[in-house]
Each structure stands twice: as C-alpha cells, then as structure tokens.
Amino acid sequence: EDESTVLVDNKCQCVRITSRIIRDPDNPSEDIVERNIRIIVPLNTRENISDPTSPLRTEFKYNLANLCKKCDPTEIELDNQVFTASQSNICPDDDYSETCYTYDRNKCYTTLVPITHRGGTRMVKATLTPDSCYPD
C-alpha cells in the first residue's frame, strides 16, 4: 500500500516525480494522492552541455505540464491487434529539442576538439559519454 508510482524520471532535466495514495490525516476514512517532486539542480553545468568551453548555466526552467507528458510510443493490444500509441495528445513536434541540464546517460554526446600533432592542428570528434557511444 506504501508503493510509489514513478510518473516522470527525466534524466535530461534531473527531475523525478512520484505519486502514491495515502490516508488523509485530517479524514482517515478518505485517501489522498501525494506527489513528490525531486529536482536536482546541476550547478556546474554548461549552457551547451556538449561544449566544455560554453559559459556556466545560471538559469534552470521546469514546466510541470511538459515534464508529465508521456510522448514515447508504447504498444497496446485491442481486440487481438497491436497498436502503437502515445499516452499524450499534446506531444511536441519531431524537431522539438528539450533543454538538457546534464547528460542523459542513454544518449551519445560528442564535441569537436582541437588536436595538435606533428606541428599541425585539426579538429577531431571526441566522445563526452563513452559508455553510451560505444556498444559493449
């Protein structure tokens, strides 16, 4: 009965929202929904997390309605047929890019860095999250 349900676990914006049903302390014959919102503010992150030379981020914005959208497609079965559906009808366009405040460890991030070798300098792609970029 004390189990929490994870509503949002957004690693990109460091937010986790859980929900659980508890007894109303003011009226023990009723249940209420308790929501817990955990936001970890990564203080030493960059404006552009893929560019280690960009300035430190000083502004963090969170929109609860956007965080709670369930836009990832999921498969459901109706009348012995499998359909792909989204749990929200207000999902952003495909070109929408969420602002990430830290690395999503499931994504591969790279950046170009200057490498000097034998008197010449050239730009080389460097991996910022190696575990996500290279298969096991």
Curated annotation (Swiss-Prot):
Keyword vocabulary terms for this entry:
Disulfide bond, Glycoprotein, Secreted
What cellular-component terms does GO give this entry? pentameric IgM immunoglobulin complex; secretory IgA immunoglobulin complex
Under InterPro entries, the record lists: Ig_J (IPR024110)
Q: Where does the record say this protein resides? A: Secreted
UniProt GO MF annotations = immunoglobulin receptor binding
Entry-linked Pfam families: Ig_J_chain (PF15097)
* Disulfide pattern: C12-C100, C71-C91, C108-C133
Q: What is its main location?
A: secreted
> GO terms for biological process?
humoral immune response
Q: What does the UniProt record say this protein does?
A: Serves to link two monomer units of either IgM or IgA. In the case of IgM, the J chain-joined dimer is a nucleating unit for the IgM pentamer, and in the case of IgA it induces dimers and/or larger polymers. It also helps to bind these immunoglobulins to secretory component.
* Self-association state and partner proteins as the record states: Part of the secretory IgA (sIgA) complex that consists of two, four or five IgA monomers, and two additional non-Ig polypeptides, namely the JCHAIN and the secretory component (the proteolytic product of PIGR). Part of the secretory IgM (sIgM) complex that consist of five IgM monomers, and two additional non-Ig polypeptides, namely the JCHAIN and the secretory component (the proteolytic product of PIGR). JCHAIN-containing IgM interacts (via CH4 domain) with FCRM (via Ig-like domain).
Write the protein's name: Immunoglobulin J chain
Gene symbol of the encoding locus: JCHAIN
